[in-house]
């Protein structure tokens, strides 16, 4: 049964003192829980989240992270995206790393390729400090952040307060494949799911007096609710990574974008392939069938980016910097934002596995 993956409340503090941040985050957390309770009358909700805007110049990311995390946790919200910076404003890489390590989510916007080395050092520095912290941080390639409920790059890009939704629905598609042709079932299921989501979201907005920004129609996995499994079904049960994978992802993405055009859509509205969050994709990466370069290729046909990929010691500064440049090239090719969430495990090599908190055992990918 489809369910809401995330109720994300976006809030924009009028000032950035510690007390102001705590007050705004507390209000947003309370509202997020109220929205979730209203929606649960019709459809299950997995998580509630709060997202802040990019930090103004001169604001200390550590102070913001501390205040935001404390206020969110006190109000039952585990997911708080609080530290978003343009890479040009990152004067001290260590401060950003320290802030993310406090438990918040965050991102750095990379609008130009000449900042690739600093961006690579951020990824490597966070991974060296804490592998789980690296799962809470992403680079965003583009001229600005997208407005999406998906973490870690959920950023308030508007004034005031509003909310957006993301959904799980891949299992609904898989369960219905025997009833319809493949492409038809995706349209039928997605239209049904997002019709319901829009209905409950508008009801919550009206009942609670908070703006509904829209839904991100992206097709995303969580472990056995596997997008990679759907891709393989559409390939006639060939393994992901085989010839034909790119074409299937492109077709699937085309359908999702068409669905997004018929709803109040925000965010990416694309196929998402976060390796550590998809049990079938983990298997293919562990087998060496899907490598980092394959994921990079798939992102050219509108996968949201290279996401939740664990790499080993063979990916040092030069290699990560090269991948950053490649992701920037994908952004320029596509013309809209893409993300990179990379976890570098020291002392590990491709084919190894690491334990990564709630994501379980995750394979180290081949470049």
Residues of each region from the PLM?
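Anaerobic metallocofactor- and corrinoid-dependent redox/one-carbon enzyme cores
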Residues: 1-367
């Amino acid at each position: 049964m489809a369910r809401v993956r995330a109720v994300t409340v976006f809030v924009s503090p009028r000032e950035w003192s510690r007390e102001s941040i705590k007050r705004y985050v507390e209000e947003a957390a309370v509202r997020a829980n109220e929205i979730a309770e209203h929606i649960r009358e019709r459809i299950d909700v997995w998580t509630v989240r709060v997202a802040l805007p990019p930090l103004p110049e001169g604001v200390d990311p550590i102070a913001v992270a501390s205040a935001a995390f404390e206020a969110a946790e006190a109000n039952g919200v585990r997911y708080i995206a609080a530290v978003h910076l343009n890479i040009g404003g990152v004067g001290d890489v260590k401060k950003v790393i320290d802030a993310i390590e406090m438990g918040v989510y965050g991102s750095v916007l990379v609008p130009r390729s000449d900042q690739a080395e600093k961006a690579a050092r951020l990824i490597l520095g966070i991974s060296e400090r804490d592998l789980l912290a690296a799962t809470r941080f992403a680079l965003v390639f583009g001229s600005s952040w997208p407005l999406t409920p998906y973490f870690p790059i959920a950023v308030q890009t508007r004034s005031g307060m509003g909310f957006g939704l993301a959904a799980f629905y891949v299992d609904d598609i898989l369960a219905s494949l025997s009833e319809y042709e493949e492409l038809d079932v995706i349209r039928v299921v997605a239209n049904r799911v997002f019709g319901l989501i829009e209905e409950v979201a508008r009801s919550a907005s009206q009942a609670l007096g908070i703006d509904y920004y829209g839904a991100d129609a992206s097709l995303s996995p969580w472990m056995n609710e596997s997008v990679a499994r759907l891709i393989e079904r559409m390939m006639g049960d060939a393994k992901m990574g085989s010839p034909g994978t790119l074409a299937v992802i492109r077709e699937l993405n085309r359908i999702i974008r068409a669905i997004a055009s018929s709803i109040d859509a925000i965010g990416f509205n694309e196929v998402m392939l976060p390796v550590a969050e998809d049990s079938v994709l983990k298997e293919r990466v562990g087998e060496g069938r899907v490598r980092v370069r394959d994921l990079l290729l798939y992102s050219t046909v509108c996968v949201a980016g290279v996401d939740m990929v664990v790499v080993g010691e063979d990916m040092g500064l030069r290699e990560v910097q090269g991948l950053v440049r490649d992701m920037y090239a994908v952004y320029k090719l596509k013309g809209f934002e893409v993300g990179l969430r990379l976890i570098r495990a020291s002392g590990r090599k491709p084919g190894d596995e690491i334990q990564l908190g709630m994501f379980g055992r995750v394979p180290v990918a081949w470049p």
